[in-house]
Structures are given as C-alpha cells and as structure tokens.
C-alpha cells in the first residue's frame, strides 16, 4: 500500500520500507516519528486529512545538502556579495502505514 503525506509544506508519496528525504524534522537518529497529516491512503481520500491513518517512520540521518553559492553583483558599482547556503534535511525510513 501507499500513502501521500504532508511534511514540511510538501506532499510525498510513501510506501512501507521506503527511504524518503524531507525538510528537517526535530529528533535524533534512531528515533521514531509519526506523520498524521495523511492526504491519501489506498483508495481513501481525506478532506483535507484522513483521520485514524498514521505513517510511522524512523529517523536514519540528520544532515545538510551540498552547498549552493549565491552571488549578487551590481553592474554600475563595485558592490559584490557572495553567500553560501546548505539546506538541512532528514532521511527517514518508513516502517509502517497504520489505517
């Protein structure tokens, strides 16, 4: 079975025993997390969310993506600005879908 959950403002299609990458979730590696914002499960559609359906996952890793460089330059002056950004993410393994 599969489900569509809402995590970090994004909708993700998940299946059991699948690994997903989400926006940063509070918690350490090895802890279990529960996603209760389930939009779709099998042939059931929520309005907006399904009650009594939960997705259980385990945090595998907290990390950051590769650095992106943001460079701003004003053409008619000597103003330049170079910034770097690394977006944090969480790797989660989906253990089961209850519902």
UniProtKB/Swiss-Prot annotation:
InterPro entries: bL21-like (IPR028909), bL21-like_sf (IPR036164), Ribosomal_bL21 (IPR001787). GO terms for molecular function: rRNA binding; structural constituent of ribosome. SUPFAM superfamilies: L21p-like (SSF141091). The keyword Ribonucleoprotein applies. GO terms for cellular component: cytoplasm; ribonucleoprotein complex; ribosome. One of its GO terms (biological process) is translation. Keywords: Ribonucleoprotein, Ribosomal protein, RNA-binding, rRNA-binding. Disulfide bonds: none annotated. It holds the Pfam family Ribosomal_L21p. The keyword Manganese does not apply. Belongs to the bacterial ribosomal protein bL21 family. This protein binds to 23S rRNA in the presence of protein L20. PANTHER family: 50S RIBOSOMAL PROTEIN L21, LARGE RIBOSOMAL SUBUNIT PROTEIN BL21M. Part of the 50S ribosomal subunit. Contacts protein L20. This is Large ribosomal subunit protein bL21. It comes from Mycoplasmopsis pulmonis (strain UAB CTIP). The lineage of its organism: Bacteria, Bacillati, Mycoplasmatota, Mycoplasmoidales, Metamycoplasmataceae.
